[in-house]
């Protein structure tokens, strides 16, 4: 697997190169968004680790340009500001996952493994749509609709919704969701799951549709027509 690491901080680039290489990845480095896009165009990697704040062309614009051309390259965004608006901006731009700085290398590696696992194609799989209320998800074509409205989701959002729609009206614990969607458990202080649930709600309720994804306080989440 070839990973392109893009960060204007040389120390960060080298640290990630060493860690990813040690864990069996082939790693290439770029110092800003312009160089990254040139490298992707000439020899597309399997995944992208992308800093947000960079000179010339920032990470969010790199995401937007790739997604605007239909490129679904897996993207893990690194952000120095762990605010909701910053994370939403990354997801809006098309990132599949985000990781706030400073981060543990073990967590970055775990997220990368989970992201690459979600990108593996299902050979010879039949397209069987999953439906709950007026929400439909096709796990093979990756199409999602609410009524007649198409919904565009990142890989992480899709995996989260797929788990919920596969377990209708069943309360799913936070730890189970983290394990199944991300492949590992976040630190208990992390609120990544809450951010993704919130963003998924925004997309599935964009036209004022009734809420289907509900919080079960102290436990997790459930997909149902009415609040628990």
UniProtKB/Swiss-Prot annotation:
The keyword Transcription regulation applies. InterPro entries: CheY-like_superfamily (IPR011006), OmpR/PhoB-type_DNA-bd (IPR001867), Sig_transdc_resp-reg_receiver (IPR001789), WalR-like (IPR039420), WH-like_DNA-bd_sf (IPR036388). It is found in: Cytoplasm. Phosphorylated and dephosphorylated by MprB. Residues 2-116 form the Response regulatory domain. One of its GO terms (cellular component) is cytosol. It holds the Pfam family Trans_reg_C. Member of the two-component regulatory system MprB/MprA which contributes to maintaining a balance among several systems involved in stress resistance and is required for establishment and maintenance of persistent infection in the host. Functions as a transcriptional regulator that recognizes a 19-bp nucleotide motif comprizing two loosely conserved 8-bp direct DNA-binding motif repeats separated by a 3-bp spacer region. PANTHER family: REGULATOR OF RPOS (PTHR48111:SF22). This is Response regulator MprA.
């Amino acid at each position: 697997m070839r990973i392109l690491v893009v960060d204007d901080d040389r120390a960060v680039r080298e640290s990630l190169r060493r860690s990813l290489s040690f864990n069996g990845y082939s790693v290439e480095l770029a110092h800003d968004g312009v160089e990254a896009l040139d490298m992707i165009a000439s020899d597309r990697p399997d995944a992208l680790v992308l800093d947000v704040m960079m000179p010339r062309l920032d990470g969010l614009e790199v995401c937007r340009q790739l997604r605007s051309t239909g490129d679904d390259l897996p993207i893990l965004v690194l952000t120095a500001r762990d605010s909701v608006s910053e994370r939403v901006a990354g997801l809006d731009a098309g990132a599949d996952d985000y990781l706030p700085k400073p981060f543990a290398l073990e967590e970055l590696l775990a997220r990368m493994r989970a992201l690459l696992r979600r990108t593996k194609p299902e050979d010879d799989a039949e397209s069987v749509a999953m439906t709950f209320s007026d929400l439909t998800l096709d796990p093979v074509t990756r199409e999602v609709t609410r009524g007649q409205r198409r919904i565009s989701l990142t890989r992480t959002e899709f995996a989260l919704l797929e788990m919920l729609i596969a377990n209708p009206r069943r309360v799913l614990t936070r730890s189970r969701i983290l394990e199944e969607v991300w492949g590992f458990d976040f630190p208990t202080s992390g609120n990544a799951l809450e951010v993704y649930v919130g963003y998924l709600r925004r997309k599935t309720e964009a036209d004022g549709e009734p809420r289907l994804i509900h919080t079960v306080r102290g436990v997790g989440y459930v997909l149902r027509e009415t609040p628990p």
